[in-house]
Amino acid sequence: MMQELIIEQTPKTPLIDLNQVTGDLLFSGRSIPENATKVYEPVLNWVTEYVLQANPTTNLRLDLEYFNTASSIYLAKMLKILTRIN
């Protein structure tokens, strides 16, 4: 079983709550980090592992009021990884 990944919200980064047990993947807030790699690399690593043992139902909630170009690149990478769920 995977550990839940929680990254607390800041004025420049969203709340990220990824839960393998429930299948809920939540992104909420603004995503304008100065270093998108620092924020999103752990997310990509978690999602890559998740698709190998995904919950039968996965609910992705992107409740982002704004995201910058760097964030959009990582979000697109994450979505591409999630398409591997069978």
Summary of predicted features, one role per range:
Residues 1-5, 53-54:
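Intrinsically disordered, low-complexity segments enriched in polar/charged residues with Gly/Pro
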Residues 3-44:
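STAS-typified acidic loop motif
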Residues 51-52, 83:
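Residue-level signal for alpha-helix termini/capping positions
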